[in-house]
Amino acid sequence: MKAMFLEIIRAEYVSGYTLKVTFNNGECRMFDFSDIIARYPVFAPLGETSRFKAFSITDTLEWDNGRIDIAPEYIYEHGKAA
């Protein structure tokens, strides 16, 4: 069986610092970025809600033209099934 690379195919803003993320395997995860924003200085700029909402999807979920990003695998493993 061929291994599937996990890719984000859609991400939707829910509220606060939570996104609903859909993967290429058909599964969805709710992921709250509150803890990451508070703990890791690189994510601190996302504490401004308008910046947090300005994400894009590439090979990762990213902000600020790739200056801030997070791997799909991390979201998948640490998010809650939606």
Where are these regions (language model features)?
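Motif-centric detector for short Cys/His coordination patterns
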Residues: 1-82
